[in-house]
């Protein structure tokens, strides 16, 4: 409950226009710990640096609350440019997108614009042997996102498109089971949006326990699993689980956020585990940065210390 109250307080303050304006003026030097620059070039360089340490990248062009269909299509074009740039740099493209950013819920000639643009993006990634992860947003978009995910897996294959489930939502265990027929590649996260107790666990202990259930059930079902957490207790539990069940290191990977626990990322890679780092980049970094601060008081303390030094 305390964690939920903390998250709510931080995100409520972050939504104030004057706070966003101040942050954009004063906090980029702090945000760049969590964001891999504002350009494609800086993001590609960040992936290359990770790969030198045996760690893969998951690129994400930041852009939320895009309102017009034209801007959504322009955003999709920019994602395609990112995929092409990654391929040109010798990187197998692995990119996350929010379907809302490419037009989910907007009609174009009788079809969802988000689905249309996602098809273009995934087709380009598939051309280069790459992969697109459909990020999950707040609970109001879960149904349509999973429906569109099912459609896209049918068209492009589970080896080229995956999605995300959030352990703080009560419904996620059922959603996971409902997707088993697809043999889906799913990233398991705890969840960073502010959700009401009617749909999400308010207590961290319940979120953590549900996270373990999601990961263990997905692994036991024989599906590729992305264990996206920095929680060392959970990481150790996953290590023990796969060892006890004879699950190979090629059946899953650990995923972490750019700028957080780099030591742990390198340690896991050195132990022979697959490790991938989520690398957000772009000018629209504020909402993402706010959610990172809201995750833990430790991140907020980092920002306060940086402001005092600055």
Curated annotation (Swiss-Prot):
Substrate binds at residues 98, 291-292. It holds the Pfam family Pro_dh. SUPFAM superfamilies: FAD-linked oxidoreductase. The record marks 278 as: Critical for catalytic activity. It catalyses: L-proline + a quinone = (S)-1-pyrroline-5-carboxylate + a quinol + H(+). FAD binds at residues 136, 166, 187-192, 229-230, 292-295. It is an enzyme of class 1 (oxidoreductase). The active site is at residues 135, 187. Keywords: FAD, Flavoprotein, Nucleotide-binding, Oxidoreductase, Proline metabolism. InterPro entries: FAD-linked_oxidoreductase-like, PRODH_bac_arc, Proline_DH_dom, Proline_oxidase. This is Proline dehydrogenase.
